[in-house]
Amino acid sequence: MGKKRSASSSRWLAEHFKDQFVQKAHKQKLRSRAYFKLDEIQQSDRLFRPGMTVVDLGAAPGGWSQYAVTQIGNQGRIIACDILDMNPIVGVDFLQGDFREVSVLNALLARVGDEMVDVVMSDMAPNFSGMPSVDIPRAMYLVELALDMCRQVLAPKGSFVVKVFQGEGFDDYLRDIRSMFTTVKVRKPEASRDRSREVYIVATGYKG
């Protein structure tokens, strides 16, 4: 006999399937509603151009990579990583592994090679416990790792887009990004649920 769903998980599922962006993604055969978040960011901030090299952290199920491919074209390149498996996308070099592990980081850097990256994007999030005192530090650790990736591979004048959950450490993190990039915006895309703490920091003009 299967486990009975909790009231909160049942509410989440009901909300999820009524979500207009979930429905739209399903109709258009897109990987996830995250596709629309990145599309909105691209419309306002113009991160992608044909021929770019992009690193996608926390890529599965592939919404961001799927969108980025449409912007960078056949001459572009995407190196994606996630702890979860992801169905192949043409033009995306996918590495499955835990980005927190040094061996996975090194494998990712090996795939990037000597070429500098034009955009680093991170949609990483931890498994949430429902306890902000636990969840926020876990989430901040992941976004710090994403920023470290910028320091290692991002080309001068490159861009960074990262999902961040507002809470302890957010202001300090934003301050660090502002010290590293010329222009920094905090975005809340329409496809992001109102009650979610998530926002997207969009940083352009990496100082290198």
Curated annotation (Swiss-Prot):
Q: Where is the active site?
A: K163 (proton acceptor)
Nucleotide-binding: is it a keyword of this entry?
no
Q: Which domain of life is it from?
A: Bacteria
For the ligand (S-adenosyl-L-methionine), the binding residues are G62, W64, D82, D98, D123
Q: Show the GO cellular component annotation of the record.
A: cytoplasm
Give a yes or no for keyword Methyltransferase in this entry: yes
Task: Please give the chief subcellular localization of this protein.
Answer: cytoplasm
List the keywords (alphabetical).
Answer: Cytoplasm, Methyltransferase, rRNA processing, S-adenosyl-L-methionine, Transferase
| Recorded catalytic activity of this chain's protein | uridine(2552) in 23S rRNA + S-adenosyl-L-methionine = 2'-O-methyluridine(2552) in 23S rRNA + S-adenosyl-L-homocysteine + H(+)
Per its UniProt record, what Pfam families does this chain match? Answer: FtsJ
The enzyme's E.C. designation: 2.1.1.166
Q: Which is an annotated GO molecular function term of this record? A: rRNA (uridine-2'-O-)-methyltransferase activity
| Subcellular localization | Cytoplasm
Entry similarity comment: Belongs to the class I-like SAM-binding methyltransferase superfamily. RNA methyltransferase RlmE family.
Explain the purpose of this protein.
Specifically methylates the uridine in position 2552 of 23S rRNA at the 2'-O position of the ribose in the fully assembled 50S ribosomal subunit.
Query: NCBIfam families from the entry?
Result: PRK11188.1, rrmJ
Q: What is this protein called?
A: Ribosomal RNA large subunit methyltransferase E
Originating species:
Haemophilus ducreyi (strain 35000HP / ATCC 700724)
Source organism phylogeny: Bacteria, Pseudomonadati, Pseudomonadota, Gammaproteobacteria, Pasteurellales
